[in-house]
Design a protein with these regions (language model features):
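Long, charge-dense tracts
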Residues: 205-207
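Short loop/hinge segments at the start of secondary-structure elements
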Residues: 226-238, 254
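Conserved, charged catalytic cores of large soluble enzymes
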Residues: 210, 220-225, 310
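Substrate-binding cleft of extracellular glycoside hydrolase catalytic domains
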Residues: 100-142
């Protein structure tokens, strides 16, 4: 364990009053809020008809299952604590019913049109069905090969009670597997809007059970692709049923600039009402998952040497677009935009915590690099790594083995897990179960980093990740503690990323090194030398001869200006370890360069930010 403190530390001051009461007796729970089964149209069309919610829950609980994609036994190394089966609300369950010959679906204009282009249900034919549905559902009907309107598709295989049976089965599965105190099965779905091809997807879940969930059908992008309509529906349905919804956006990296916008989808300036609605319903963002990492991009954060991580530019439309990144596509840029918008309208619409989840379409939350089940049927086997996935122009090896959500909750129940999301006391990892505590305040000392109970000091003197710093005396200080995943690589370093808004309304960012392994010293540019790399490229094995099992530190902002709004979050980096594509390349006997991906990666964790807002 290494304990480190940087910055000029202040003497202990009385902590200013914190705005909201927060629990202090929290434990770490691991989960996945984004998992698909064959009730999702794309899972079925990608050739995985045997994936069920029951399979997903059994797998998440650590039980061995027969893989729906390979037919072999698959099992997590350690169980998860919670799971959301979040099948696409659009046509939920309808595609399996179509190909099983259910006349309610098959004997319609849409059903007949889709069956006509897939008479034998070959891989190519099912991909064609998928492409047509995506184009029509995205408002790109003119580019489709079949003469079918979105209105007709909705009427035939989505509208009315056509989804009721599958939704009820989804609810029943969650009720069967929910075991308060041991395993939490949350009821949820995915709203899968992609107007003009830009990803605006949200996963929605709630702490309530069947008595509430059975009162509605999940809102989908076939009702509206505008997130403002989703928020209105959440508000209205919450008032009618008592559902305490949470909506989690994901994959801003493929949103073509629409995710953290400066104007609404309809082209109006963002106003206070928009900002308040978004902030109310969306407390966190899924920053890392199989379809890439959305924390930062090297073109947007050119001075950040670790911004180049699992970049994934492949928009989901069949045309194969890979647009350049914009500030609307990445979370760090979005956090900065939020500060600027708050200065204009009084509310920060992008005041979000960060989590990871899988977006697995295999029915299994399997994202360990050496136990990766792939995104779906098209990239499950090593030899499929160079093959198209059916998702835009991506190939199997473009998929990253990520991620999970770490949640600091009072207990493992639906209510406590959702409460932690709402107060943003959650964080993201790219897969390894790195334990991270992060607190901000005005009285942390070096001794706090060496305390036997860091959490007690953190809660007593400050606010945890997701919190707001009240205005205090002097510059704020931050207490961070990270411990490695017991079966993964050691830790390289802990950094704090700061973003702020200056007096001229311009935003800035900076990466600070806080604590690190070994005797390295930062250079004149503030950057640390690389830690090294123990990965054997012939075998895919590595050793923990470098790095530390735990890193703790206290850091005080040396550039603090009390007049500038700011956010701070911690990023924890592992030592280099083999990427799943390296292991595939070794197994296949091909050059790792043929995968188009790096041989090794530095897995990481991102905490939710802590915000500072001047009184004025």
């Amino acid at each position: 364990m290494r304990v480190f403190a940087t910055g000029v530390l202040t003497t202990v001051l009385s902590l200013p009053a914190i705005a909201a009461e927060r629990p202090t007796d929290t434990s770490l729970y691991w989960g996945d809020t984004h998992l698909h089964t064959s009730n999702s149209f794309d899972v079925y069309l990608f050739g995985t008809p045997g994936s069920t919610p029951d399979t997903a829950f059994h797998f998440a609980k650590g039980e061995p299952v027969v893989s729906p994609t390979t037919g072999v036994r698959w099992q997590l190394k350690a169980p998860l604590d919670f799971l959301v089966v979040s099948d696409h609300a659009e046509m939920i369950g309808s595609i399996p019913r179509l190909f099983k010959g259910d006349p309610v679906i098959a004997d319609t204009v849409t059903g007949r049109a889709l069956l006509k282009i897939s008479p034998d249900q070959t891989v190519e034919q099912l991909q064609q069905v998928y492409d047509q549905i995506v184009l029509i559902g995205s408002g790109l009907e003119d580019e489709a090969d079949i003469d079918l309107s979105a209105k007709q598709l909705i009427q035939d295989i989505h509208a009315g009670e056509k989804r009721r049976t599958t939704w009820d089965e989804t609810i029943e599965a969650a009720e069967r597997h929910n075991d308060p105190g041991n395993f939490t099965a949350l009821i949820g779905w995915e709203w899968s809007a992609q107007p003009k091809g830009g990803n605006l997807h949200r996963v929605v879940f709630m702490p309530e059970g069947a008595d509430v969930a059975s009162q509605f059908l999940p809102y989908s992008a076939l009702e509206s692709t505008d997130p403002e309509d989703l928020w209105r529906w959440l508000e209205e349905t919450s008032e009618k049923t008592g559902a305490d919804f949470v909506a989690i956006p994901h994959n801003p990296n493929i949103s073509i600039g629409l995710f953290f916008p400066t104007e609404t989808l309809s082209g109006d300036p963002i106003d206070a009402e928009y900002a308040k609605r978004r902030a109310r319903w969306e407390p966190a963002v899924e920053v890392t998952q199989i379809k890439g990492d959305s924390e930062a991009h090297p073109l947007l954060s050119p001075t950040d040497e670790f911004a180049e991580y699992e970049t994934y530019p492949f928009v989901l439309t069949p045309d194969g677009r890979t647009p350049d990144p914009t500030e609307g596509d990445y979370v760090r840029s979005g956090l900065k935009r939020g500060l600027a918008i708050q200065a204009e309208v009084g509310t920060n619409p992008y005041k979000v915590g960060m989590i990871g989840s899988t977006d697995s379409h295999t029915g299994m939350s399997a994202v360990e690099e050496d136990n990766f089940a792939g995104k779906g049927q098209h990239d499950t086997y090593p030899e499929q790594g160079s093959h198209p996935t059916g998702l835009g122009s991506s190939k199997g090896w473009d998929m990253g083995a990520a991620g999970y959500a770490g949640v600091w909750a009072t207990e493992n129940t639906r209510e406590a897990i959702v409460a932690a999301f709402k107060r943003k006391e959650v964080y993201a990892t790219t897969g390894p179960r790195i334990s991270v505590r992060f607190f901000g305040g005005y009285g942390f000392e070096k001794a706090d980093a060496g305390s036997a109970d860091i959490a007690a000091a953190g809660y007593r003197k400050g606010v945890p990740m997701g919190g707001d710093l009240a205005v205090g005396e002097g510059a704020p200080s931050f207490l961070v503690a990270a411990m490695k995943d017991p079966v993964e690589g050691n830790l390289d370093r802990v950094q704090i990323i700061k973003g702020w808004l200056d007096k001229d309304g311009k935003t800035h960012e900076k990466v600070y090194e806080v604590t690190w392994s070994g005797d390295r010293k930062p250079g004149t540019d503030g950057k640390l030398p690389p830690i090294g790399n123990t990965v054997d490229l012939r075998t895919g094995r590595y050793t923990n001869d470098i790095g530390e099992e735990a890193l703790m530190g206290v850091w005080q902002d040396p550039d603090f200006d009390p007049a500038q709004p700011a956010f701070y979050y911690a990023r924890v980096l592992q030592i280099p370890t083999p990427r799943h594509s390296l292991l595939d390349a070794i197994a296949l006997g091909v050059d790792v360069e043929d995968t188009g991906r790096p041989a090794t990666i530095q897995e990481r964790a991102y905490t939710s930010p802590i915000w500072y807002t001047p009184e004025s």
